[in-house]
From Swiss-Prot:
Catalytic residues of the enzyme: R154, K178, H244, R247, H270, Y279 (o-(3'-phospho-dna)-tyrosine intermediate)
GO biological process terms held by the UniProt record: cell division; chromosome segregation; DNA transposition
Stated name of the protein: Tyrosine recombinase XerC
Classification via CDD domains: INT_XerDC_C
Name of one Pfam family that matches: Phage_int_SAM_1
Length: 305
């Protein structure tokens, strides 16, 4: 078993990371292994300057790898993810005494331009969640959308929800987030009403998934993505609506109303407030639009144009 395979086994068995996280590590480290295997002489022999075993790499080898991935057209964000996986891998090797220093510790990928998350305005969000409940699966769709927008869950968190995680009388949901961290999140009154209706209709037990898939178990993330796109079209929305737009909209609208960045951080389950601060830029965009529409000098400037 290679060092990379051992590390992946450690992540799965000891760290018990999610399947999604494990797949991401596997893809990123597979790219490193493939690059190493491609470093051959004209005779097809492994280049003596590049070890076939990634555990023997130094920082120069990793810089060559990152440069090769960059030439291949990988985005700055993807390069950052590749390096993050490498740092975790080499930190694991270091902790186990396999290497004396991590070759990835000092390496930095190019900074990715920070894109602002796409959001729906309040009217658009309401139009999306108020899908007809008399259509096939209408009660489920309404409950799913209401919970998504009401509580700002991640897509993976929404799909994993079980009825036992919900306390509809108290209006709270216990969410198992990234890193197996639990957090309590409020559930709005419209979402509670939709969930009660959906549970009465489905007759589900406490251990059942709130939103089951066709084959049993939890609904897949892909199924939710497709369904939300379909529902957005049915509701006459012309934006390319994707699930995380509801989470982003939740965060943006809460921050816009309250100005409480720390509170939004806790609701979203962000470990680093810097991740939450992206929504302050959205709030500033909104304020800038209000200014342009309302400030007398802004209006005069617009009229002059």
């Amino acid at each position: 078993m290679s060092s990379v395979d051992e590390f992946l086994t450690y992540l799965q068995v000891e760290r018990q990371v999610s399947a999604h996280t494990l797949d991401a590590y596997r893809r990123d480290l597979a790219a490193l292994v493939v690059w190493a295997s491609e470093q051959k002489t004209d005779d097809g022999v492994q280049d003596a300057a590049v070890p076939a075993e990634t555990a023997q790499f130094d920082s120069a080898h990793l810089r060559q790898f990152v440069a090769a991935e960059h030439r291949r057209g990988l985005s700055a964000k993807s390069l950052q993810r590749r390096l993050s996986a490498c740092r975790s891998y080499y930190a694991w090797l270091l902790k186990r005494g396999r290497i004396s220093a991590s070759p990835a510790a000092a390496l930095r990928a190019p900074k990715a331009p920070r894109k602002l998350p796409q959001v729906l305005d309040a009217d658009e969000a309401v139009r999306l969640v108020e899908v007809p409940t008399d259509a096939p699966l209408g009660l489920r769709d309404r409950a799913l959308l209401e919970v998504f927008y009401s509580s700002g869950l991640r897509l993976s968190e929404l799909c994993a929800l079980r009825w036992r995680d919900l306390d509809l009388d108290s209006g709270l949901v216990m969410v198992l987030g990234k890193g197996s961290k639990q957090r309590l999140v409020p559930v709005g009154s419209h979402a509670i009403a939709a969930l009660r209706e959906w549970r009465r209709d489905s007759g589900a037990s406490a251990d059942s998934h709130v939103f089951p898939g066709r084959a049993g178990g939890a609904i897949s993330q892909r199924a939710v993505q497709i369904r939300i796109k379909q529902l957005a079209v049915r509701q006459g929305m012309f934006k390319d609506v994707h699930p995380h737009m509801l989470r982003h909209s939740f965060a943006s609208h809460i921050l816009e109303s309250s100005g409480d960045l720390r509170g939004v951080q806790e609701l979203l389950g962000h470990s680093d407030i810097a991740t939450t601060q992206i929504y302050t830029h959205l709030d500033f965009q909104h304020l800038a639009k209000v200014y342009d529409a309302a400030h007398p000098r802004a209006r005069r400037k617009k009229a002059a144009e």
